[in-house]
Amino acid sequence: MVNRKIPKIRFKHFGDGWKSDKLGNLGTVARNKRIFKEETSEVGEVPFYKIGTFGGKPDSFITRDKFEEYKSKYPYPKIGDILISASGSIGRTVEYQGEEAYFQDSNIVWLKHDGRIDNSFLKHFYAIVKWQGVEGTTIKRLYNKNILETPITLPSISEQSAIGSLFCTLDDLLASYKDNLANYQALKVTMLSKMFPKAGQTVPEIRLDGFEGEWVEKRLKDISKRVTRKNNDLVSERALTISAQFGLIDQEEFFQKKIASKDVSGYYLIKKGEFAYNKSYSTGYPLGAIKRLDKYENGVLSTLYILFKAVDVDSDYLAHYYESDKWHREVSMCAAEGARNHGLLNITPVDFFNTRLVVPKELEEQRAIGSYFSNLDNLINSHQEKITQLENLKKKLLQDMFI
């Protein structure tokens, strides 16, 4: 008896049951002819993708003569075929789009099928597939048998095409948002480096229209006030940490557990809009990180942090200034080479507040710069949120539109 099923979510005009089958009944596993190392070079005419460069940038090439010979004599993917990684991170996929390329035998394979399955449907089936004989094991290889014995439940070819088309549209939308996000993030990095003066200069390389004149040098102590209030009355029990992406964030939200001591009455109490300097250095943060609390009304931080609030400077300007690396030179001069203790820079509050920074003389320009970067952050955040929403939608639809 044929096992007939239907998914939870379905296009209205389809009503037939789905049929259970195996990939091996639909086709065979194909692969390119083996290429030996001595047949490749670091530069050449046709890219040769190994498992380590699959889906990325090639680092090996073969001659056009070899490519044309092997393409004509041995199996080669058709446009639309879904290539699969059979070793390492098994099951990664790349849709072959007709480009001139050759792929490492046995490590990169595809299902050469008879047309009873739509490639766009197959591509997204691979996103949720449980390979036969692999699940729950430590096997890091996908053998032909694993692929061919894997069960699949199929609707009609027209319904497969409709489902595949929907997910391809979602993928295109996700790719568009991710490209835009990368562009906005790159723009921010560039503008952070160019909209604040370089060391020894008093005018930035790029300046907003309508402003002129030299910027002025200030010491941090002249434009801010140190915050040393303790959490004596347990106003807050939200222990914070500094994250590159999220700034000051709840430890439990970030680490999925609380790192701080159970008794946080001796911690500093930081309020929304105030800044914290974490002297702990790490990859990408050679001199620690300075972030403003924006996410919550208050929180607590270890007394190893240095806290302050903006007084005679626009707070948004200061927040984005400390996202750049323009303050690194001053702090590095205070923290002498080798003066590091258990992952912390050995810099005193007095030295920290004596660091110099250059700011626009006019408050209006400070605000304009702060507003520029805040708007850019809003664009970045909205794209990140949209990507998360689309990824969650795709995950849900994959669960409910396949069997």
List the predicted regions and their residue ranges.
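Extracellular/lumenal glycan-associated surfaces
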Residues: 7, 161-173, 180, 216-218, ...
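A short beta-sheet element
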Residues: 50-51, 61-127, 143, 265-327, ...
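Non-catalytic DNA-recognition/assembly elements of restriction-modification systems
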Residues: 9-33, 207-231
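A short glycine-rich beta-alpha junction/loop motif
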Residues: 3-7, 102-108, 136-161, 298-304, ...
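Short amphipathic coiled-coil heptad-repeat segments
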Residues: 1-15, 176-213, 385-403
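DNA target-recognition patches
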Residues: 24-27, 37-68, 228-260
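Short, solvent-exposed loop/turn positions at domain surfaces
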Residues: 35, 71, 136, 151, ...
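Long, compositionally biased tandem-repeat segments
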Residues: 11, 18-22, 156, 167-174, ...
